[in-house]
Amino acid sequence: MSERAAFGTSVERLMVNFTNPDPSLGDMRSEYIGGNNNRNAHPYLSDYNVRRALSLAIDRQILVDAGYGKAGKISCNVLPAPAIYASSANDECKTPNVAEANRLLDAAGWKRGSDGIRKKNGVRISILYQTSTNSVRQATQAFIKEMWKQIGVETELRNLSASVFFGGDISSPDTYQKFFTDIEMYTNNFSGTDPQTYMSNWTCKEMAQKRNKWGGNNMPRWCSPAYDALSAKMSISSAMKDRIRLTKEMNDMLMQDYAMIPLIHRGNVSAHSNTLSGVRMNPWDSELWNIADWTRK
């Protein structure tokens, strides 16, 4: 048997909570309250330097090799495909830089305490990091915990049954939509080849919160009027060159503000008999899309 992988739009990523998930806040937990995260901001993830340091510390190739093999490759974008939309502006993520991550945190005033964990103004960088129960995801969590330890970040790992995490029960505190932790991890993608609807997921109106019964698609509660303007412009732009430019700008804005931290571009895997030739995987269609070209060797 031969194995092949085709890479579409699936990206395993870390979602960064821009709002405060402290349980003591009650109904205001992980709620966006006016302005750009200035009234219920996350106590440390609202600091750009912390978000950037978390990304810099991750060796994504280790995650690929340990959990995905040929079915994964490093992604520095939330939109890695189709290729015409893929930005090259964020490729620094392919090479971890622990020294720079530590320098950033030092310069921003996040100093290591006696336990080695960084803190500032009494706030410790202690992350609760959740995902669904899955052996590959738990391995990824364990690797990232050790990587973040190198920069003075404490990490508590949590995994939940996929039926709960992805379930959407508005009475449950454990769904990915409610996002009552600091960091969460999962894969998302879109069908088809036009990214307009997908990229609109991170507009301000899409924030998942109590008022819309956590039905929005903007889990980080990241809000940028500039991003909203790009999304609105894309909705009325028909020229392909303009749509490509706008899509890349939107992707880069998300990536360079670390609204989320992409990890792995996940492929669709299939196998076929060694006696067949002409088999080509296509992430946009059925595995049988070119069956008319198949022949026996």
Please name every model-derived segment.
Residues 1-69, 73, 83-259, 281, ...:
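Extracytoplasmic/periplasmic ligand-capture domains
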